[in-house]
Every structure is written in C-alpha cells, then in structure tokens.
Amino acid sequence: MPEVSVVIPVYNNAGTLPLALDSALSQEGSLEVIVVDDGSRDEIETVMERYTADPRVCYVKNPKNLGAAGSRNRGVAMARGQYVAFLDSDDCWAPGKLKKQLRLLEDTGSVLCCTGRELMTPEGKLTGRVIGVSAVISYRDLLRHNSINCSSVVVKREAALEFPMEHEDSHEDYIAWLKILGKYGPAAGINEPLLRYRLSAGGKSGNKLKSARMTFLVYRYMGFGKVKAAACFLSYALHGVWKYARAFLLS
C-alpha cells in the first residue's frame, strides 16, 4: 500500500498538468497519484498517455461534472494511502515536500500539515514572492485567516473522508480545514515555500469582492449565527487590510 495518495483534480489544464504530475512523482517515498478528470475538453487524455506505464498513476474521468470539490472527494474515496495530499493541476511541488511533511506529522501527532508557497506567474515563472505559514495553526487562528493553501496540504485519509469538501459557492477547502482542526486540534506548518502556486486572475479567489462574499459564506456554512459570522468576517477583513498595508509599506 502507498503511504501517500496524491489527488489531482483537473479540468482543461493540459498545458500545466505535466509539471504538477512530474513534481508529485519525483517525491521520495511510497505514493500513488490519482488524477480526476472533471470533463476536460482539451488534450488531457493525450497527456495522460505518457504516464500509462507508471503503476503509481491512476487516471479516472467523472461521468458528469462534479467541480473541484467533488473531484477531490472522489479522489479521496479512491485513495489507499494513510495520508492524502492535494495538488491542483496548475501548481507544483518543490523536491522533498512530502518527506518533510510526513516527518513533521509523525513528530507532532497532527492530522494535517501545510507549507509555505512561492507564487508563480500564469506562465509558470517563479516570482520570488513567498507566503509563509506558522509552525502551529489553531482553529482560532484559522477562523481569523485561512493560511492553509489546498495544494500544500497533507492530511490523514480518515479525516479527509470524515470531512469532505462541500459548498463550492464558498471556499470549500477552508470549511474542511476548519472542521478538521475543530475536531483534531492544530495543524502543523512548515515555513518553507515547498508549494509553487500559480497565480490566475480567473480563479475563484481572483475577484476580491467575490472572495470576501465566499468567506462570509464559509462562516455561515459552519453554522455560525449572523453576529458571530459578521465578527469573524470583520477579523478576516482587518487581516486583509493589514496584509496589504504591510506590503505597501515594505515595497
């Protein structure tokens, strides 16, 4: 059995998928890579033909469009590893990422580990801009600010199965992390840019107002009343103002 199951949802990203796949397959240790195709209309099948000889790679096509969350959930349901690692098809990992995370999970007893990230341009050029993470991320920390990037996460499979990703009209991964930390305790963080995250103006979070609305919905889907949801959202908004003010002052 593999120790880690890497789940890659893909939709019309034939141009970036090979970089993501190669970065996963080059990681040390025992792993499988599950590519879940959500009805792509580009050359995904042609890309995947290059990997048919690798027994670690499993390629499945959704019978109908499930969205990114549903595709990740399908991959988790198929996973055989003790841990699940998520990787979007337009991102990639630095060498040694999984090994470092598995070691930290073992040392800390946490069920979820995330890492820092370096931003890439839409064309795949590294920008040198790094976004770090804290060594320990509590449920309360996460309520104030979602510092956990999905493509950096390694999580115990049982926890991912218990709390699948839901509500794609919000930040579905954020809801899952909150539920996992709420039950199992703090996440462990590695403050190194082991994820290379591709910027995309067309992504779900590209529009700041849309992202803000989605964040408010996260708190509502968590079952918070309007007052508590508004208080959490205010904290989120203030953190965003501080982040951009700090970036401006340091520029």
Tell where the protein language model's regions lie, with residue ranges:
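Cell-envelope/extracellular polymer assembly enzymes that use nucleotide-activated donors
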Residues: 2-5, 32, 175
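Short, acidic, metal-binding catalytic loop of nucleotide-sugar glycosyltransferases
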Residues: 22-31
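A conserved acidic beta->alpha catalytic loop
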Residues: 23, 37-46, 64, 88
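Glycine-rich, basic loop-to-helix element that forms the pyrophosphate-binding segment
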Residues: 62-79
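Conserved nucleotide-sugar donor-binding catalytic segment
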Residues: 77, 130-210
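Short aromatic/hydrophobic "clamp" motif used to bind/position activated sugar donors
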Residues: 84
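Conserved donor NDP-sugar-binding/catalytic core segment of glycosyltransferases
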Residues: 96-127
